[in-house]
Swiss-Prot record:
Name of the encoding gene: lpxC
Organism listed in the record: Xanthomonas campestris pv. campestris (strain B100)
PANTHER family linked to this entry: UDP-3-O-ACYL-N-ACETYLGLUCOSAMINE DEACETYLASE 1, MITOCHONDRIAL-RELATED
One Pfam family in the UniProt entry: LpxC
Protein name: UDP-3-O-acyl-N-acetylglucosamine deacetylase
Catalytic activity line of the entry: a UDP-3-O-[(3R)-3-hydroxyacyl]-N-acetyl-alpha-D-glucosamine + H2O = a UDP-3-O-[(3R)-3-hydroxyacyl]-alpha-D-glucosamine + acetate
Active-site residues annotated for this sequence: H264
Tree of life domain: Bacteria
Broad EC category: hydrolase
Enzyme Commission numbers on file: 3.5.1.108
GO molecular function, one term: UDP-3-O-acyl-N-acetylglucosamine deacetylase activity
Cellular component terms (Gene Ontology): membrane
Length: 303
């Protein structure tokens, strides 16, 4: 049986929001079966809960943001990616501000936090969204697509006219499993170009950004002293983002995802298109006495 998972213990972290620059206190708490991932704005009176739901996405400019009952939750994609990577289904995320902490710009610190809290299996089968028919969305030359596949596979291609992002380093594929996610994807950081800084500042974006939490490029090179963590860190981060954005569908995906120059907006459009086409997907689980799911999650981590 492939079971649902939650945290063993409550764990806390502090950081700054990438776009707001605000200090934020975050608490991750265990949640019961079928609870799902729910964000909780504890700085509001009364407290407002915001489910991790693709239908609640209202912000896709340089991050993925949710709105529910007037409360915003910004930049959810890196934590959502880590939760998907470790197979965590049920968790409460308490925040003292509207934006999650950016940490180091990857999902690595969130993976560490979740593993430090401990991950436990729960007494109910995990629910997967199995892709039955292809679903594709486009925006200009950008494409995002789901296809049936026995497992979970992601492929992504980026195109940037920059010497540090040549064509041979613009493509990445991953056969999803916890070990592949942690090793190959989780440490890839978000990135930005100096030329876009003015645009971002005018819109009050990137106010918490620095070389401590992003890869920064000028016209020719990477400005971070420690360089890159992977030679193709840029496209790997796009897969990290996609895994987080797609987890807002409400369950783990069984299928193949392909992105060409896609981003948060198109990823969300793809999930909405999928959920709206009831013939294109189905809920499946692997209860006791049946085969294991085709996606491999690491053994639970008992902190």
């Amino acid at each position: 049986m492939t079971q649902q998972r939650t945290l063993k213990n409550t764990i806390r972290a502090t950081g700054v929001g990438l776009h707001s620059g605000d200090k934020v206190y975050m608490t991750l708490r265990p949640a019961p079966v079928d609870h799902g991932i729910v964000f909780r704005r504890v700085d509001l009176e009364p407290v407002v809960e915001v489910p991790a739901d693709a239908e609640l996405v209202t912000e896709t400019t340089l991050c993925t943001g949710l709105t529910c009952n007037g409360a915003k939750i910004q930049t959810v994609e890196h934590l959502m990616s880590a939760l998907a990577g470790l197979g965590v289904d049920n968790v409460i995320v308490e925040l003292s501000s509207a934006e999650l902490p950016i940490m180091d710009g990857s999902s690595g610190p969130f993976v560490f936090l979740l593993q430090s809290a401990g991950i436990v299996e729960q007494n109910k089968a995990k629910r997967f969204i199995r892709i039955k028919q292809p679903v594709e969305v486009r925006e200009g030359d950008k494409v995002a697509r789901f296809e049936p596949y026995e497992g979970y596979k992601l492929g992504f291609t980026i195109e940037f006219n920059h010497p540090m992002i040549p064509a041979k380093q613009s493509r990445q594929e991953i056969e999803f499993s916890t070990s592949a996610y942690v090793k190959e994807i989780s440490r890839a950081r978000t990135f930005g170009f100096m030329r876009d800084l003015e645009y971002m500042r005018e819109r009050n974006l990137g106010l918490g950004g620095s070389m401590d939490n992003a890869i920064v490029l000028d016209e020719f090179r990477v400005l971070n002293e420690d360089g890159l963590r992977y030679t193709n860190e840029f496209v790997r981060h796009k897969i990290l983002d996609a895994i987080g954005d797609l987890y807002l569908a409400g369950g783990a995906i069984l299928g193949a995802y392909e992105g060409f120059k896609s981003g948060h907006a198109l990823n969300n459009k793809l999930v909405r298109a999928l959920l709206a086409d009831q013939a294109a997907w189905e809920w499946v689980s692997f209860p006791e006495g049946t085969e294991q799911s085709p996606v491999t999650y690491a053994s639970p981590v008992y902190a």
